[in-house]
Swiss-Prot record:
Gene Ontology MF term list: cysteine-type exopeptidase activity; dipeptidase activity
The organism's taxonomic lineage, starting at the top: Bacteria, Bacillati, Bacillota, Bacilli, Lactobacillales
Keyword Protease in annotation: yes
One record GO biological process: proteolysis
Family note: Belongs to the peptidase C69 family.
Name of the protein: Probable dipeptidase B
Enzyme class: hydrolase
Domain of life from the UniProt record: Bacteria
InterPro entries in UniProt: C69_dipept_A-like (IPR047804), Peptidase_C69 (IPR005322)
PANTHER family on file: LD30995P, SECERNIN
Amino acid sequence: MKIENRRKGSCTTVLVGRKASIDGSTMIARNDDGHEALDPQRFIVIQPEEQPRHYKAVLSDLELDLPENPLRYTSTPNAVLKEGIWPAAGINSANVAMSATETITTNPRILGLDPYVENGMGEEDLVTLVLPYIKSAREGVERLGQLLKTYGTYEPNGIAFADKEEVWWLETIGGHHWAAVRIPDDSYVVAPNRMNIDEFKFDNDDYMCSSDLKQLIDANHLNPDFEGYESHYNLRHIFGSSSIKDSVYNNPRTWYGQNFLGNPSEDPQNQELPFICEASRKITVEDVKFVLSSHFENTKYDPYGSTNSPEERKLFRPIGINRNHSVHILQVRNNVPDELAGVQWLAFGANTFNHVVPFYTAINDTPASYRDAKGEYDPTNMYWLSATTAVLGDSNYDLFVDLRNTFELNTMAKFHEIQNETDKNFETAEDKIAYLTQANEKLAEAAFKAQTELLGRMVVLGSANMKLRFDFND
């Protein structure tokens, strides 16, 4: 399949260092957005014996042998596999999390030097090729970097890794090059669909890159900055974009997320918003979910606004959007037994009317309502139930938003209650994996019941406010 015809994602990422989070955990989170509104997703666990030993891509002619002894890992693949697996994200049995990918931008100068590789790797492949084989976030960067050097890529992507201690962000550069940054423990990132890494230090252990990246920049006069030309390297300036599209599609998302998380600024179109922000308060899972569901609330750019103009409502691309296929918040907790550390908070469908569920990842199966989505509509599956709720909610947001808010408060409280109880009684369980698998069943049951109840209440409320009505009756 030609590069220009391949499917492209369109996501938003949030990264949180362990000292920036409320409980000392690391978090990497992303909306898995697509190019069309519906694309059913599944939540599964891959056992070592199920991992292929020889991999063949669907969208390219890439083939390679994979190492022996893979780790168990979770993933959220497409239900319809005609364009590949697209695992999106997961946590492995070493409690290493990976999210892949955030589509980013590039420029013709680097592509003229290091063109894309027609039969290289892409988003459909990366989790399968990396996550089962790494035991730290840094190892994830190293393995992916080596794969990029060997096989190349046909698209620009950002990839996140986390373990108990570290959060890393890697961005591909051209066909074979890459750069990665360790996010400081006290900081966070809100990353849209552009090249995000700004200041880069080649002589620092918290930065990693292709071995010849600095030489590539210097020898080919790629650095556009005057100030500190020989020592200052802003990779967004060198390899990325600063376009009109960025000013309406990308930068406003970063601006809104940073404002909400405590780093306010005035200009939503600013091309120089920082990549990394020091946290001004401790960040919760609920904070991350709000950012990834947001649509410029309390600003004149809200598509659901009632006091702004039609032009203002359509000016910027919101983070929460109809093309949200799923959202994951991969949390690696400290100060708990290893089996409890990896938590994959997960929701399907447009984020305005869904809820994230804290699924444990040291498991041997996933709940059927999250595992068994098909391409055909089926409201007994959480993907389709969430999609139904989102469509109805979008029809009259102001009418339904209070129901949504109450629903989210109550469901998140219930999930925390189940999680606290599961954590508390974990040591008494004889079969730890079976115990956590059953806890996930309890979480899924509560989630499905709550989502069904929300939809029912929305139908009842909406039926009394339909346009097709007449106030006289018999």
